[in-house]
């Protein structure tokens, strides 16, 4: 099963999918979907259309220059079949894909690390620019501690006599009120 690549977006085209366009000079263009075909008919440049692989490679968002890509090049040289070379080829393909995955993941991590550094620099600049808006949580700490100490000292200095609290049963109080006791009598009751 041969897997073709789209002329416009460079994605894979599996058998039975996509459209072929043949120009008058017998040049064959294969497209994975109508979106790519329409963009080609509108004479769009794949390197300037943001969602294509060509754009991502041109903009440095994906790994573009690497020796592992040399293995994917098509070679139109017929070779005599032998089982050994076939097995070696399969092993080599597995090894190449492993290496390519490692390199692309490393490339992505480096890109993310650069973005993080830029973000930190922007944050530092923003803080320096707007320093007046930021107030440290410890800015008024000394004043608060001094104020609390003064309040505690004031409470300690005040030696007010403690009020004597007497508890009265609520039911008894209600009965007395119903019976018509006066206010003076209630005060005497509390004392």
Curated annotation (Swiss-Prot):
Q: Which residues form a coiled coil?
A: none
Q: Which terms are listed as keywords in the entry?
A: Nucleus, Phosphoprotein, Ribosome biogenesis
GO terms assigned for molecular function: structural constituent of ribosome
SMART domains (alphabetical) = TRASH (SM00746)
- Can you list the GO cellular component terms from the UniProt entry? cytosolic large ribosomal subunit; nucleolus
User: Where in or outside the cell is it found?
Assistant: Nucleus, Nucleolus
Q: Pfam families, alphabetically?
A: Ribosomal_L24e
A Gene Ontology biological process term: ribosomal large subunit biogenesis
Modification sites for Phosphoserine = 136
Concerning InterPro entries, the annotation shows:
L24e/L24_sf, Ribosomal_eL24, Ribosomal_eL24-rel_N, Ribosomal_eL24_CS, TRASH_dom
CDD domains under this entry? Ribosomal_L24e_L24
Partners and quaternary state? Associated with nucleolar and cytoplasmic pre-60S particles. At the end of biogenesis it dissociates from cytoplasmic pre-60S particles and is likely to be exchanged for its ribosomal homologue, RPL24.
**Family classification:** Belongs to the eukaryotic ribosomal protein eL24 family.
Recorded protein name is Probable ribosome biogenesis protein RLP24
Q: Which organism is it from?
A: Drosophila melanogaster
Task: Name the encoding gene, please.
Answer: RpL24-like
């Amino acid at each position: 099963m041969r897997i073709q690549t789209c002329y416009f977006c460079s994605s894979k085209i599996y058998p039975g999918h996509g459209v072929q366009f043949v120009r008058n000079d017998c040049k064959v263009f294969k497209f994975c979907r109508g979106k790519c075909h329409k963009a080609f008919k509108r004479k769009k440049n794949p390197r300037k259309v943001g969602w294509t692989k060509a754009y991502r490679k041109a903009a440095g968002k994906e790994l573009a220059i690497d020796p592992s890509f040399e293995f994917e090049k098509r070679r139109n040289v017929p070779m005599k079949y032998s089982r050994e070379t076939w097995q070696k080829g399969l092993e080599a393909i597995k090894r190449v894909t492993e290496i390519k995955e490692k390199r692309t993941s490393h490339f992505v991590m480096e890109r993310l690390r650069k973005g993080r550094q830029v973000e930190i620099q922007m944050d530092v600049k923003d803080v320096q620019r707007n320093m007046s808006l930021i107030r440290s949580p410890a800015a008024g700490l000394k004043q608060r501690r001094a104020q609390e100490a003064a309040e505690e000292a004031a409470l300690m200095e005040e030696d007010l006599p403690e009020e004597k609290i007497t508890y009265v049963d609520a039911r008894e109080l209600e009965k007395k009120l119903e019976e018509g006791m006066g206010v003076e009598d209630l005060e005497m009751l509390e004392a």
